[in-house]
A protein has these predicted regions:
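Single conserved hydrophobic/aromatic residue that forms the stacking wall/gate
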Residues: 1-11
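Active-site-proximal cap/loop segments of hydrolase catalytic domains
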Residues: 9, 14-201
């Protein structure tokens, strides 16, 4: 039988018992649409090591994809990845670590943890530093105490390694992920001559 294409949808931890209605979603792929068009959807659970969120994603995702290729479930020449917000960051990081994907859609990603750390959430005015030190990003330190940790986890500084075409989707009214992160991503990719598109939605 002909192999299917694969699409990874990356965020954090998922649940086996969560049914997604066949309807448009605001920031994730339509599983039913892709599956009915012969895509295998891989939605991995990411187990994080504090201080290494990007590498944690890579270490959880890649063995699963490698296994699906080895078992003939997916065609290694037809694999894409999608993520939004935290997932957008993770697929941006993945693009700097592997050329396995044929295309990546990175929605509302953070690519520079230094500049994002110093920002605020526009709607509330809350400083964004908390999420880099203690919550979602799990860096466990400030950029002054552990600058290398921020550097290693910021895709912006290793974009010269990217070979995958990337679609960046962002929103200039996003109150959570700074719009300028999408701009930094796009400008860096274009400056490096990488295939990249930016949609402001």
């Amino acid at each position: 039988p002909e192999m299917s294409r694969g699409l990874g949808d990356v965020y954090k931890r998922q649940t086996l018992y969560n049914y997604r209605m066949p309807e448009p979603h605001r920031s994730t792929i339509d599983y039913h649409l892709y599956n009915s068009n012969e895509y295998v959807i891989f939605n991995p659970d990411i187990r994080y090591v504090d201080g290494y969120p990007g590498e944690s994603c890579y270490n959880c995702l890649m063995p699963g994809i490698t296994m699906m290729i080895a078992k003939g479930y997916i065609d290694e020449k037809g694999i894409g990845a999608q993520g939004h917000s935290w997932g957008g960051y993770q697929v941006a990081y993945l693009a700097t670590r592997t050329n396995l994907f044929s295309a990546i859609e990175s929605g509302a990603p953070v690519v520079n943890m230094f500049s994002a750390y110093g920002g605020i959430r526009w709607g509330s005015g809350m400083a964004r530093s908390f999420q880099y030190e203690h919550t979602q990003s799990r860096l466990g330190a400030t950029p002054w105490s552990s600058p290398l940790r921020y550097l290693e986890n910021s895709p912006l500084f290793t974009m010269d390694k990217v070979q995958t075409p990337i679609l960046i989707m962002h929103n200039d009214a996003d109150g959570h992920v700074p719009w300028y992160q999408g701009i930094e991503y796009f400008v860096a990719m274009k400056r490096l001559g990488k295939p990249c598109w930016l949609l402001n939605y």
